[in-house]
Amino acid sequence: MFHKLLNKSEILAYDKKYVNNYIINVENLSFFYSKEKVIDDISFQVKFGEIVTILGPNGGGKTTLIRILVGIYRNYIGVIKYAKNFIIGYLPQHFSVNSLIPMTVKYFLNSSYTKSKRKLKLSDVLKDINIEKILDRQMSEISHGELQLVLLARCLMLNPDIIILDEPVSCMDVNAKDSFYKLINKLISIYNLSVIMTSHDLHFVMSNSYRVICINRSIYCEGSPSEIVKNEKFLKMFSSYA
């Protein structure tokens, strides 16, 4: 196992900013739940500025892979190399808000990180994520789409190198999904970001990804959206989506 905490001062440092021109390099990664192998010898890289989407069926290992990359799961087999001084922003698939604890959106964002960890002030990110109108509302009262924007703003306050999102649009309608992906594309250029995300939505994946990695415990195809849609393994796996 080869992993470091996501604290900037503790990330594995390399002489070059990027690892052989990649911001993340995953080599021969496997992971077991008890005796069941749920990730099987996965290798891939993420370049600076890419949107990479992890696509696959339920139970195929997408969320497990994400949790390994962000440091939640550590007892894996394989090697993960990050670029020097690497910072990750993480938007989980499920984020619960306790309705019994009064907390405004503004308080939640300002109290999410210590001053030493927070690289940008809330005011710095509000100009790019339009959530000013909900800052004084209770966290328990905002919609799922609004919550995703709040969590995205929270990620940006770290001034990350990459944002990793697990099923970020799963509960959004078509218009909200479209707006969210447009925002992600805008943020990439503003903040010099790379993005890894998981998704089930083929339409939005194909129109908003630079590269797609299809996994079902192991990688069965990988490439640009135009390459993936011609892949026989992909067509067989996702024929029910057509």
UniProtKB/Swiss-Prot annotation:
Q: Does the keyword Cell membrane apply?
A: yes
* One Pfam family of this chain: ABC_tran
Q: What is its EC number?
A: 7.2.2.20
Under catalytic activity, the entry for this protein gives: Zn(2+)(out) + ATP(in) + H2O(in) = Zn(2+)(in) + ADP(in) + phosphate(in) + H(+)(in)
Read off the SMART domains from this record.
AAA
- Name the membrane topology term: Peripheral membrane protein
Asked if the keyword Cytoplasm belongs to this entry, the reply reads no
Q: Which UniProt keywords apply?
A: ATP-binding, Cell inner membrane, Cell membrane, Ion transport, Membrane, Nucleotide-binding, Translocase, Transport, Zinc, Zinc transport
Any GO molecular function: ABC-type zinc transporter activity
Q: What is its main location?
A: membrane
Q: Where is the ABC transporter domain?
A: 24-241
Which GO cellular component does the record give, naming just one?
plasma membrane
- Residues reported to bind ATP: G56, P57, N58, G59, G60, G61, K62, T63
The record's listing under InterPro entries reads: AAA+_ATPase (IPR003593), ABC_transporter-like_ATP-bd (IPR003439), ABC_transporter-like_CS (IPR017871), Metal_Ion_Import_ABC (IPR050153), P-loop_NTPase (IPR027417)
Where in or outside the cell it occurs: the entry states: Cell inner membrane
Per the record, the similarity remark reads: Belongs to the ABC transporter superfamily. Zinc importer (TC 3.A.1.15.5) family.
Per UniProt, subunit arrangement is: The complex is composed of two ATP-binding proteins (ZnuC), two transmembrane proteins (ZnuB) and a solute-binding protein (ZnuA).
**Which function does this protein serve?**
Part of the ABC transporter complex ZnuABC involved in zinc import. Responsible for energy coupling to the transport system.
* PANTHER family per UniProt: METAL TRANSPORT SYSTEM ATP-BINDING PROTEIN TM_0124-RELATED (PTHR42734:SF17)
User: What is this protein's record name?
Assistant: Zinc import ATP-binding protein ZnuC
Encoding gene (name): znuC
